[in-house]
Design a protein with these regions (language model features):
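Short polybasic/polar patches that bind polyanions
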Residues: 32, 140, 168
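Peptidoglycan-targeting cell-wall enzymes and recognition modules
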Residues: 2-22, 50-165
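Amphipathic alpha-helical segments within well-ordered protein domains
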Residues: 11, 28-32, 164, 185, ...
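Extended serine/threonine-enriched, polar tracts that run as long, contiguous segments within proteins
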Residues: 159-173, 188
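N-terminal carbohydrate-binding/catalytic regions of secreted carbohydrate-active enzymes
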Residues: 13-36, 40-43
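Short, mixed-charge amphipathic alpha-helical segments
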Residues: 29-37, 147-154, 176-179
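Alpha-helical scaffolds flanking conserved acidic
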Residues: 4, 38-47, 178-185
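Acidic helix/loop microenvironments that form the catalytic cleft of cell-wall polysaccharide enzymes
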Residues: 49-53, 131, 176-195
Length: 196
């Protein structure tokens, strides 16, 4: 049996969002196509994606870090003298993205091998899809280039669809059905970020 997501319920789940109508339309259109059609699955999907996107308000990753925050979050990408190096990058989001998301400096590769890829393929959408490889995979799924997909993901429908694509590729409906929030969170953000 399918669960109907009502607009007034969504408004309570994403407080402070001024675009509830557009989000409701996108969710109602896209979620069923990915089997996110039960109350439990929708609850997990909306809670995880609202955490990742600040209640559906932030569709692009904020990389405007101070030097201190930059070192705390991305210090390992700044070599032997991270403090001196990070000072050059602080408050320069494009420069930060091109450094920390460049495959040259990462153990976990993202497919970012061309100049500017870090910035072009920074986190976007409800899931904060990141890296040329992820945008290429999603783009193939929706018949777009990686570059087109990066733009699409910054729209409500594209943000929902890219999150659903990720959800589906990671088989998160199965985990939602077991109500394992910790396991799901680890798959989505690589750790336990956001868990109380």
């Amino acid at each position: 049996m399918s669960f109907e997501l009502k607009k007034e319920h969504l408004a309570k789940l994403i407080p402070g969002n001024k675009n509830v109508d557009a989000w409701h339309a996108a969710l109602v259109d896209v979620l069923p196509k990915y089997g996110i059609n039960t109350e439990r699955r929708m609850a997990h999907f909306i809670s995880q994606t609202s955490h990742e996107s600040n209640n559906f308000n932030s569709l692009e990753e904020n990389l405007n870090y101070s030097e201190k925050s930059l070192l705390a979050v991305f210090g390992r990408y700044f070599g032997a003298a991270p403090k001196a190096s990070a000072a050059e990058y602080a408050r320069n989001p494009e420069k930060i993205a091109n450094r920390v998301y460049n495959d040259e400096f990462r153990k976990y590769k993202m497919g970012n091998t061309k100049p500017g890829d870090g910035w072009r393929f920074r986190g976007r959408g409800l899931k904060q899809l990141t890296g040329r490889e992820n945008y290429t995979g999603f783009g193939k799924f929706v018949n777009m280039t990686a570059e087109q997909a990066a733009d699409y993901v910054a729209t409500p429908k594209g943000a929902v669809e890219s999150a659903c694509w990720f959800w589906d590729t990671k088989k998160l409906n199965n985990i939602a059905d077991t109500d394992d929030v910790t396991k799901m969170t680890k798959i989505i953000n690589g750790g336990n970020i956001g868990l109380a």
